[in-house]
Amino acid sequence: MKVELCSFSGYKIYPGHGRRYARIDGKVFQFLNAKCESAFLAKRNPRQINWTVLYRRKHKKGQSEEVAKKRTRRAVKFQRAITGASLAEIMAKRNQKPEVRKAQREQAIRAAKEAKKAKQAAKKPAAPSAKASTKTAQKPKIAKPMKISAPRVGGKR
C-alpha cells in the first residue's frame, strides 16, 4: 500500500483518497482534499495556516516529549601515551617543578652549543691549509678582448 504526502498540508494520503494536480511545467502535486487544493491554488503559505504540518513544525508544536529524550555527548579528556614517550614519562615531566625543568633545558642548550663549537673548531684548521695551497698556484686573470660585431642595419628580419 503506497501512502502519499499532501503537497500542501503534509498529511498522509491513503489509496483511493485525494486529488492530483499537474501543472503546465510538468510538476505534479498531491492534495488530501479540496480544502488543501483550493488553499494551494490561492497561493496561501502552509507555514501560516494553523492546521498544517509545516505550521506545527515551524512553531514547535507537539515536540515536548522528544526534547526530554535528546542527550548531548560531552567531550571527555583522556590521557594516553604519544609515540616515543610513555604515559609515565609524560606525567613525570609534567609533575616536575619549573626550576628543575628550566635547569635541564639550559643544560641541554649548553651541551648543544659546545658540540657545535667543537665541530666548527675541527673544521677551521683544515680549511685554511687547503686555501693557502690554491692561492699560490693560481695565475692572474687576463682580460679577453671582446669581439665587436658590426652594427645591425635594417629591421627585425
Curated annotation (Swiss-Prot):
- Matches recorded under Pfam families: Ribosomal_L24e
What's the superkingdom here?
A: Eukaryota
Q: Where is the composition biased (Basic and acidic residues)?
A: 96-117
What GO terms describe the biological role, i.e. biological process, of this protein? Answer: cytoplasmic translation
Where are the stretches annotated Disordered? Answer: 94-157
Record-level Gene Ontology MF annotations: mRNA binding; structural constituent of ribosome
As for what it does, the entry says: Component of the large ribosomal subunit. The ribosome is a large ribonucleoprotein complex responsible for the synthesis of proteins in the cell.
Please give the SMART domains that the UniProt record associates with this protein.
TRASH
Q: What is this protein called?
A: Large ribosomal subunit protein eL24
What family is it from? Answer: Belongs to the eukaryotic ribosomal protein eL24 family.
Composition-biased stretches, type Low complexity, lie in: 123-140
Gene3D superfamilies xrefs: 6.10.250.1270, Ribosomal protein L24e
- What keywords appear on the UniProt entry? Cytoplasm, Ribonucleoprotein, Ribosomal protein
Q: What is the lineage of its organism?
A: Eukaryota, Metazoa, Chordata, Craniata, Vertebrata
Compartments reported by the entry: Cytoplasm
GO cellular component terms, alphabetically, are: cytosolic large ribosomal subunit
Q: What quaternary structure, including any partners, is listed in this protein's UniProt entry?
A: Component of the large ribosomal subunit.
Q: Which PANTHER family match?
A: 60S RIBOSOMAL PROTEIN L24, RIBOSOMAL PROTEIN L24
- Say if the entry is tagged with keyword Ribosomal protein: yes
